[in-house]
């Protein structure tokens, strides 16, 4: 579960390394985000000559969370770290590569471009 002030890793090659959630989108009282949800992030750490720079405010899709993800068949998956992929205003990824596995739940939330770029879908 991701809430305001949560730090996340960036799972793409946009140039950002760490981001902080500053808003969970989807309602005025919404507190938590999970896999597939869109959040607003501030870039806290970035590499030189990347597509984004420190201090930029962007949208991101949460792709991995430490909290258990329960599936309809009763199975549970869990990741070691929280991670997100930066997106633009048209909901397309800013980077051209995705690092690490992503869960199938992104397919239900219509993030097919992220699914197709990912090296592994769990």
From Swiss-Prot:
Any one biological process term the GO annotation gives: translation
Classification via InterPro entries: Ribosomal_uL14, Ribosomal_uL14_bac-type, Ribosomal_uL14_CS, Ribosomal_uL14_sf
Listed GO MF terms: large ribosomal subunit rRNA binding; structural constituent of ribosome
Keywords assigned: Ribonucleoprotein, Ribosomal protein, RNA-binding, rRNA-binding
Extent of the signal sequence: none
Keyword rRNA-binding: yes
Cross-referenced Pfam families: Ribosomal_L14
Record's GO cellular component terms: cytosolic large ribosomal subunit
Keyword Ribosomal protein in record: yes
Domain of life: Bacteria
Role: Binds to 23S rRNA. Forms part of two intersubunit bridges in the 70S ribosome.
NCBIfam families: rplN_bact (TIGR01067)
Binding partners and assembly: Part of the 50S ribosomal subunit. Forms a cluster with proteins L3 and L19. In the 70S ribosome, L14 and L19 interact and together make contacts with the 16S rRNA in bridges B5 and B8.
Protein family: Belongs to the universal ribosomal protein uL14 family.
Protein name: Large ribosomal subunit protein uL14
Annotated source species: Nitrobacter winogradskyi (strain ATCC 25391 / DSM 10237 / CIP 104748 / NCIMB 11846 / Nb-255)
């Amino acid at each position: 579960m991701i809430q305001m002030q949560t730090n996340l890793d960036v799972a793409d090659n946009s140039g950002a390394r760490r981001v902080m959630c500053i808003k969970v989108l989807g309602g005025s009282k919404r507190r938590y985000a999970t896999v597939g949800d869109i959040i607003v992030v501030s870039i806290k750490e970035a590499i030189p000559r990347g597509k984004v720079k420190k201090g930029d405010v962007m949208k991101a899709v949460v792709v991995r969370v430490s909290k258990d993800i329960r599936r309809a068949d009763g199975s549970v998956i869990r990741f070691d770290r929280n991670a997100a992929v930066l997106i633009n205003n048209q909901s397309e990824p800013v980077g051209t590569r995705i690092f690490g596995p992503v869960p199938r739940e992104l397919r239900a939330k219509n993030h097919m471009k992220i699914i197709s770029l990912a090296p592994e879908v769990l």
